[in-house]
Amino acid sequence: VIAAMRPDLEVILVESRKRRVDWLERAREGLALENCRVAGCRLEDVERIDAGTVSARAFAPLDRLLDLAGRFSTKTTDWVLPKGRSAAQEVQGLPKNRRKMFHVEQSRTDPDAGVVVGRGQWSAKP
């Protein structure tokens, strides 16, 4: 959706499962999304870039997701992480001095779900 709505942005979709990679590739080709690339590998194997936005859904617990994706972040990276019902609890589980980087927004599609939103650089070691 982002690649279709914002052709001025480079969008990289990371997915390690072959069937999903194939589906994403077909969708990308069918929609002629020139600005979209599918990386068919684990996040840990993706070449480091400076990401303007990091978004991930149902990937890993928040602390692990941040540690894995943090190497792509800069001081101006926006984080948009749909986390469902556990959003507030997962933010509270972060180290106190680092949780201030994030807040929880109400999901627009599920009244019981939250989206973790933040801005800034995350490193695995504080």
What is the predicted role of each segment?
Residues 1-52, 66:
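Conserved SAM/SAH cofactor-binding pocket of Class I
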Residues 10, 35-37, 78, 100-103:
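Conserved beta-strand segments of alpha/beta enzyme cores
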Residues 16, 59, 82-86:
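Short strand-turn motif at the edge of the Rossmann-like AdoMet-binding core
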Residues 25-26, 66-70, 91-94:
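Short amphipathic alpha-helical segments
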Residues 55:
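A conserved beta-strand element that flanks and buttresses the S-adenosyl-L-methionine
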Residues 63-79:
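A short glycine-rich, Lys/Arg-flanked "PGG" loop and its adjoining helix->strand segment in the class I
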Residues 75-89:
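Conserved beta-strand signature within the Rossmann-like core of class I S-adenosyl-L-methionine
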Residues 86-126:
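Active-site capping/gating segments
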